[in-house]
From Swiss-Prot:
Functional summary from the UniProt entry: Component of the ubiquinol-cytochrome c reductase complex (complex III or cytochrome b-c1 complex) that is part of the mitochondrial respiratory chain. The b-c1 complex mediates electron transfer from ubiquinol to cytochrome c. Contributes to the generation of a proton gradient across the mitochondrial membrane that is then used for ATP synthesis.
Binding site for heme b b566: H96, H192
Cofactor note: Binds 2 heme b groups non-covalently.
Family, similarity comment: Belongs to the cytochrome b family.
Protein name per its UniProtKB record: Cytochrome b
Species in which this protein is naturally found: Toxoplasma gondii
Length: 368
């Protein structure tokens, strides 16, 4: 039984990581999918290590984090690695998604695109849950503001809070979910790879080509080279950047009676935080936020229709879609800047314009 299981595992390993055929003209942008998987593994390793010392009790959570950083051997390295790798997870996912948009991967890799979108949503949820765990001022008030903005969702937010406000029960639930969700994410990554290899990966030319090589050693070596660069960047940021990616207010214990001057979540939340912030109605902001995510899902579903594929082949050029993707990227960067700004009238106006541009580009990509 053991030998049969081992033989099956090795056959799957050889099929997907040795003999799998991929196009010869793949460039470095195709390595970010592999980097996403590796950053997930690094996050799980550092997260489990940190969980040994963390206390999910409202009265002790902040003190346990400070004890971990100041007194535990190599504690600050693991915390900085965990926080820094979280940023690189989102950076790799966003670059991977942008490459998929730019090269039309969503039009004929529908199941792979949808599984990747589910992974993106799961990563956002996991990061938000982990953002609250240090139990500093910015974590507490950021969780309070964001859960308040998401409160129109029935049942979900009250169940997560465990009451009427962010409390000790909320912290315990966030810790448990933050521990479990990355393992679910690993399952989705495996499904994503399965769906990708089931249909075959795309290539920059956007056409089927007979020039294919085995995954090993060609692609595996390029993946290893990019992974070495990524690990170097992560360790440089973790060792020398330290708390640059965090907010100073998060080093202050929670005070329910003092609100920070400006609520600023992590940079990878800022685009969607800006969408929620610039819409005066909570329900309206939530609908726009959900629409921005649904747009990404509709891309693969609409483009899978034969009629849309025929229209694309007859009346559209590659440069049109590439141009709209570039506008989509710029609108998201602009939303990130607006999300980090103080909510004044000028920034709110620019944020609404950027939100309209972001949604419009998504709809245009769906129609094309």
């Amino acid at each position: 039984m053991v030998s049969r299981t081992l033989s099956l595992s090795m056959s799957l390993f050889r099929a997907h990581l040795v003999f799998y055929r991929c196009a010869l003209n793949l460039n470095s942008s195709y390595n970010f999918g592999f980097l996403v998987a590796m950053t997930f593994v690094l996050q799980i390793i550092t997260g489990i290590t940190l969980a040994f010392r963390y206390t999910s009790e409202a009265s002790c959570a902040f003190a346990s984090v400070q004890h971990l950083v100041r007194e535990v051997a190599a504690g600050w390295e693991f915390r900085m690695l965990h926080a820094t790798t979280a940023s690189f997870v989102f950076l790799c996912i966003l670059i991977h998604m942008t490459r998929g948009l730019y090269n039309w991967s969503y039009s004929y890799l529908t199941t792979a695109w949808m599984s990747g979108l589910v992974l993106y949503l799961l990563t956002i949820a996991t990061a938000f849950l982990g953002y609250v765990l240090p139990w500093g001022q910015m974590s507490f008030w950021g969780a309070t503001v964001i859960t308040n903005l998401l409160s129109p969702i029935p049942y979900l937010v009250p169940w997560l809070l465990g009451g009427y406000y962010v409390s000790d029960v909320t912290l315990k639930r966030f810790f448990v979910l933050h521990f479990i969700l990355p393992f679910i994410g690993c399952i989705i990554i495996v499904l994503h790879i399965f769906y990708l290899h089931l249909n075959g990966s795309s290539n920059p030319a956007g056409i089927d080509t007979a020039l294919k090589v085995a995954f090993y050693p060609h692609m595996l070596m390029t993946d290893a080279k990019c992974l070495s660069y990524l690990i170097g960047l992560i360790f440089l940021q973790a060792a020398f950047g330290l708390m640059e990616l965090s907010h100073p207010d998060n080093s202050i214990p929670v005070n329910r009676f003092v609100t920070p001057l400006h609520i600023v979540p992590e940079w990878y939340f800022l685009a969607y935080y800006a969408v929620l912030k610039v819409i005066p109605s909570k329900t309206g902001g939530l609908l726009v936020f959900m629409s921005s995510l649904i747009n990404l899902g509709l891309l693969s579903e609409i483009r899978a229709l034969n009629t849309r594929m025929l229209i694309r082949q007859q009346f559209m050029t590659r440069n049109v879609v590439s141009g709209w993707v570039i506008i989509w990227v710029y609108s998201m960067i602009f939303l990130i800047i607006i999300g980090s700004a103080i909510p004044q009238a000028t920034y709110i106006l620019y944020g609404r314009l950027a939100t309209i541009l972001y949604l419009t580009t998504g709809l245009v990509l769906c129609l094309y």
